[in-house]
């Protein structure tokens, strides 16, 4: 798959990022991961991000990363394209990128470098180095310490033909508009704020109709129903799902830092696809919060295809 073919795929439909399965000892559980991917594939996501932020990329050892990406690529070979999360220092990100390409990933999601303060010129050099290390398509994730502006992204687009996507996790509307207007069709644009559904209508109005869904991990039918309602401008259905599900969901998710991942793993367990515990420094939901989420999911009804 060429980077441009991947860009076309990422320009339409709903995207998601499966959680990574761990066993009771906290080790990668490939059998559980295969079961998860096989369950999610028929629901119709356009692409899946393996070992992304919600997939706890930041907690995986290098050997585990290879297992996760290989398992995802092999399992989804005939069903849905897999993009691999990559990040860390520039040299680490390049190593992960080359490994993901070797294992057959169709593209990369370049996560922000961790903790280290850097100028945005330095961040741009980091992105360029990763792009030039591989031939597959790369999506850059503007979030936290990565805050690339339209000028830098335009420069990167000229230098890196395989930089084909921009994912926004900042929520800076002025910046998003300037990037979208400047870069036009050069990129695919993805909404990437946590619980992106809450912002989906606003981002669609900005020319960003595609987003990645965390709740697809445990209420995939509800996630697809919401996406289709956004796509057809069914404002009544959008409003009802936001009121009935997404706002109460946020009330739980926002109780502790890191719950954006923890609540997804809790939801997967409630749905019958237990992915095990989150790894430290994240913490799992309390028993009370777990029951609150279970009651909320029950209101959404069966999640059959």
UniProtKB/Swiss-Prot annotation:
Q: What keyword terms does UniProt attach to this protein?
A: Lyase
Q: Name a GO molecular-function annotation.
A: 4-hydroxy-tetrahydrodipicolinate synthase activity
**Which reactions fall under this protein's catalytic activity?**
5-dehydro-4-deoxy-D-glucarate + H(+) = 2,5-dioxopentanoate + CO2 + H2O
Q: Which residues form the signal peptide?
A: none
**Known EC number:** 4.2.1.41
* Pathway where it operates: Carbohydrate acid metabolism; D-glucarate degradation; 2,5-dioxopentanoate from D-glucarate: step 2/2
Recorded superkingdom: Bacteria
Lyase as UniProt keyword: yes
User: What Gene Ontology terms for biological process does this UniProt record contain?
Assistant: D-glucarate catabolic process
Q: Please name the InterPro entries in this protein's record.
A: Aldolase_TIM, DapA-like, Dehydro-deoxyglucarate_dehyd
Q: State the similarity comment.
A: Belongs to the DapA family.
Name-wise, this protein is Probable 5-dehydro-4-deoxyglucarate dehydratase
Species whose genome carries this gene: Pseudomonas entomophila (strain L48)
